[in-house]
Amino acid sequence: MNNVIPLQNSPERVSLLPIAPGVDFATALSLRRMATSTGATPAYLLAPEVSALLFYMPDQRHHMLFATLWNTGMRIGEARMLTPESFDLDGVRPFVRILSEKVRARRGRPPKDEVRLVPLTDISYVRQMESWMITTRPRRREPLWAVTDETMRNWLKQAVRRAEADGVHFSIPVTPHTFRHSYIMHMLYHRQPRKVIQALAGHRDPRSMEVYTRVFALDMAATLAVPFTGDGRDAAEILRTLPPLK
């Protein structure tokens, strides 16, 4: 497992990893370090980090679960309710139907406001999901991941341990919910409108997006290059020529 770039030990190569058009990994990593230093911004992974972490999930069932969290931003409880029937992979615009966790305790057809559709825009992920379903042949209404939340967390911990044993380290704690934060940040990096991301993530309150967008406020401030230091001697000479204030 030595063909993954160590994420902290090769700065020259790391800086070349793309995050989004016009954004490199080194810059995004520095911005994340600044944004999360106060604890106000949720911890998130960048795209190369997610790719590396998925690499250390050789079990396809584990891999496809976390690839699904990454590609959709859904909550872990929502993922547990997914069935093959939830996915539409054959059309021109593949998508997944996500049921609100509130639906779990009810029977019958869920209300419209408790179902959301999320486009699957990564064709590689769509092909992987198709292949996995063909191989495993689950029943159409059978949950794809009928396991406990704790089991899912253990799968993730195993992958993190494999990565660390191979010299790949992550600078933030990684949990299943990290993939949701990572999805939202990835969409923001790709300049998707806030209201669109809010709808896809299932956030009812627009203010919930503010914890993510403040990262880009820091980025904007950092790139303005506003100078504050001047030549004190020259300033004093200029001020000396002015009449005294009355």
From Swiss-Prot:
Q: What's the domain of life for this entry?
A: Bacteria
Say if the entry is tagged with keyword Signal. Answer: no
The record, for InterPro entries, names:
DNA_brk_join_enz (IPR011010), Integrase-like_cat_sf (IPR013762), Integrase_catalytic (IPR002104), Resolvase_Rsv (IPR016423), Tyrosine_recombinase_XerCD (IPR050090)
What keywords are annotated for this sequence in UniProt?
DNA integration, DNA recombination, Plasmid, Repressor, Transcription, Transcription regulation
Q: Which residues form the Tyr recombinase domain?
A: 40-225
- A Gene Ontology biological process term: DNA recombination
PROSITE patterns, A to Z: TYR_RECOMBINASE
Annotated protein name in UniProt: Probable site-specific recombinase
